[in-house]
């Protein structure tokens, strides 16, 4: 079964609360019904839904309506990261009681240069490890060094590096209404990814090429770094994702579905099956078809 391991669904801000910015202005709409239609058209059986921010309402409601079709990721707010008022573990539990998410996304782990165990976020990260929840990371550059320390301190924590593990910085919105970045893989990031690949519970998402490349699919200007990442992590720790809705029109869902085979023409059917769904199903086994559970 093909699984889209990272897709965003949301409604206009006046319909369901969410943040507003240049990428997702107030009237932009990405309802789950459209995603389901796109998935059906392309033979995709399940997806992992990621809200735009800490507003859980819409994805929570979608998950309640489609509990076997979707897994869900919550986005950590300052209170969950221990940078607000109150106990961050209590805040995590309050949100999870209302919204049964299976992973938590963050751009922040702790104070650069300080031990990860001293981070106010560490108690929450330990709860994730203890409860078998994934950490969905989209770390800014000064946070990536903390990820390896975290993987060492909490070896049972499953960490999924979003969008090939690159560190977002200086985002702009392109003419197609998509995020875009320059210089996504400096030598320091590539070295950190190699170190992280040695941690068996660290995974990487095969996605985001559209925002990182200066070419059209199959984004051959990224071949060197993508093959380097794939060689380090292996297909069994890679997850294909569309990053819907930013990619819905350009390059289009089909182009992204074809990308693993185009990028790895020597990959075996089993390796391609892992990238396009097998890995995600191991992380989110409730998405497996009933006959395979």
Task: Write out the residue ranges for each language-model feature.
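Mid-to-C-terminal alpha-helical segments outside catalytic/metal-binding sites
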Residues: 1-5, 23-46, 227-228, 232-239, ...
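Active-site neighborhood of phospho(di)ester-bond hydrolases with catalytic His/Asp-centered motifs
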Residues: 2-5, 49-50, 73-74, 105, ...
